[in-house]
UniProtKB/Swiss-Prot annotation:
<dbReference type="InterPro" id="IPR002171">
    <property type="entry name" value="Ribosomal_uL2"/>
</dbReference>
<dbReference type="GO" id="GO:0016740">
    <property type="term" value="F:transferase activity"/>
</dbReference>
<protein>
    <recommendedName>
        <fullName>Large ribosomal subunit protein uL2</fullName>
    </recommendedName>
</protein>
<keyword id="KW-0687">Ribonucleoprotein</keyword>
<dbReference type="GO" id="GO:0015934">
    <property type="term" value="C:large ribosomal subunit"/>
</dbReference>
<comment type="function">
    <text>One of the primary rRNA binding proteins. Required for association of the 30S and 50S subunits to form the 70S ribosome, for tRNA binding and peptide bond formation. It has been suggested to have peptidyltransferase activity; this is somewhat controversial. Makes several contacts with the 16S rRNA in the 70S ribosome.</text>
</comment>
<dbReference type="InterPro" id="IPR005880">
    <property type="entry name" value="Ribosomal_uL2_bac/org-type"/>
</dbReference>
<dbReference type="InterPro" id="IPR014722">
    <property type="entry name" value="Rib_uL2_dom2"/>
</dbReference>
<keyword id="KW-0689">Ribosomal protein</keyword>
<dbReference type="InterPro" id="IPR022669">
    <property type="entry name" value="Ribosomal_uL2_C"/>
</dbReference>
<feature type="region of interest" description="Disordered">
    <location>
        <begin position="227"/>
        <end position="279"/>
    </location>
</feature>
<dbReference type="GO" id="GO:0002181">
    <property type="term" value="P:cytoplasmic translation"/>
</dbReference>
<dbReference type="InterPro" id="IPR008991">
    <property type="entry name" value="Translation_prot_SH3-like_sf"/>
</dbReference>
<dbReference type="GO" id="GO:0019843">
    <property type="term" value="F:rRNA binding"/>
</dbReference>
<keyword id="KW-0694">RNA-binding</keyword>
<dbReference type="GO" id="GO:0003735">
    <property type="term" value="F:structural constituent of ribosome"/>
</dbReference>
<dbReference type="InterPro" id="IPR022666">
    <property type="entry name" value="Ribosomal_uL2_RNA-bd_dom"/>
</dbReference>
Length: 279
């Protein structure tokens, strides 16, 4: 999906670069696949802020996405046709409404790049390499770009789901397949785990510029205040006479080193599946 540069009608449109949604579905979403979504504004069940800089966005409804193409061990569909591509306010990627050829049941999936209306999607058809086809990693040819990758067979895709992201199948080792993730990390994943062919849609999102603070607020993002601009009671780097640099190496509001300090547990069980760290 291309981006559009707004003309400088006013200060907020000057320099703004937004995704062009003109090719997306303009009607209502599929009612059967909607759930109410309550905004918690970054608070937990005790009402305390656990995620900062969240809150104040417009009301949205959650779209039920089929991250797994299977239900109770059986495929949701073997063949399905794409009815339309839609905007989803809950994620950066676009979503596709697909309908099963046999039962006519609708489903939402993450739309891969290049998918369009009337395309036919397949599940476990191993000779179909079209974008949106789903199959086990063990059946994906080496060098193929994939997304929505499972970590456990049947659990649904957990990796590579954001706009424009993709992973690449590069090798096989026994019951495992070596996959290069968007971070550059090379990880072994069970060959029986499913993945979807192609890269995720809306790759141009990385080129956008919101142009004004209000657009961030529409998305539920509240302002982020620098620690050195706070008082000592609010942040370890706060206080001082005049403008100061904080007086110490950068830390989080809770005193943990930030700016690149590695926090992963070296004894984590999944470390044995990681063959190469992030670039």
């Amino acid at each position: 999906m291309p981006v559009k540069n707004l003309k400088p009608f006013n200060a907020s449109s000057r320099g703004a670069v937004l995704v062009d949604y003109s090719e997306l579905w303009r009607g209502s979403p599929e009612k059967k696949l909607l759930l109410p979504k309550k905004s918690c504004s970054g608070r937990n069940n005790a009402g305390r802020i656990t995620v900062r800089h969240r809150g104040g966005r417009g009301k949205v409804r959650y779209r039920l996405i089929s991250f797994s193409r299977f239900s109770s061990g059986a495929p949701l569909f073997t063949k399905a046709v794409v009815e339309r591509i839609e905007y989803d306010p809950n994620r950066t990627a676009f979503i596709a409404l697909v309908r099963d050829f046999k039962t006519g049941l609708p489903s939402y999936i993450i739309a891969p790049e290049g998918l369009k209306k009337s395309d036919v999607l397949s599940t476990d058809v191993f000779d179909d390499m079209a974008p949106g086809a789903c199959m086990p990693l063990g059946k994906v040819p080496l060098g193929t770009t994939v997304h929505n990758v499972e970590l456990k067979p049947g659990a649904g895709g957990q990796l590579v789901r954001s706009a424009g992201s993709s992973a690449r199948v590069i090798a096989r080792d026994g019951n495992y397949t070596l996959v290069t993730l968007p971070s550059g990390e090379k990880r072994l994943i069970l060959s029986t785990c499913h993945a979807t062919i192609g890269a995720v849609s809306n790759a141009d999102r990385k080129n956008t510029k919101l142009g004004k603070a209000g657009r961030s607020r529409w998305l539920g993002r509240r302002p982020s205040v620098r620690g050195v601009a706070m008082n000592p009671v609010d942040h370890p780097m706060g206080g001082g006479e005049g403008k100061t640099s904080g007086g110490r190496h950068p830390v989080s509001p809770w005193g943990f080193p930030t700016k690149g300090k590695k926090t992963r547990d070296p004894n984590k069980l999944s470390s044995k599946f990681i063959k190469s760290k992030k670039r």
